[in-house]
Amino acid sequence: GKSDTLVNPVVLTYREAGKRLSPDGSLWGWLPLNGFHNETRFNRLGELEPTPALSDDRTSWPSFWPDRLDNPDDPGWSNEWNGFFGRGVFNADLEGFYVIDDYSDLEYSVDPETQQPLSQWGVFYPSPSDSTIGGLALQTKVRIFQWANILAEDTAFILYRITNTGEKDYRYNSSGDEGVFFGQIMDYGLGNEEGDENAAFDALQDVTYGWDQDGIGQHPDGTLYDLGYTGFAFL
């Protein structure tokens, strides 16, 4: 008969709710690649505070961009913004950029000490020739765009460019028992106070949206304010 469907969760790295750790305490999940932000960035108070690279904050940029080293005219684009629209191009009013991979998600590997599978679901290596790579061997370049234009001022556009760097082929087949499906976890913690959030899906508009039960938010100082709705959709 037809074999059971193999489901390999890539990651649920959401604080304590989905965090998975190895026996030695290492995080299993998506982690940022080094070199795409300034790891020694200090904030205005003189405190070490690295952030993802932001187009309006030069202190968040790395000294060069690893993905631009092959540029023949300006290898690494040093001191230039690594913009989606080109070198030093600021099309959006604010653009963020970071790169992550799931190589550290080794929960489906073999424990080097016991030589036993770490997971009850078995062993999976996305690149059998390299057992140090976990997850699905996926690398994702993420860009976030915001514009101040009144038609888009309340919207963040997020572009995910996902690359399979491993040796396994995840292409969908006609039998429907293989392939990769993209999803997103959203935490509708609206209004700085949780416990009364709701979410729903509008099938006609193809939008997931969330709202606060009483429509009232609370500032850290205790003052209250009216809340709106927030929505999420794949384009």
Which functions belong to the PLM regions below?
Residues 1-235:
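A long-range scaffold signal marking pre-active-site subdomains of enzyme folds
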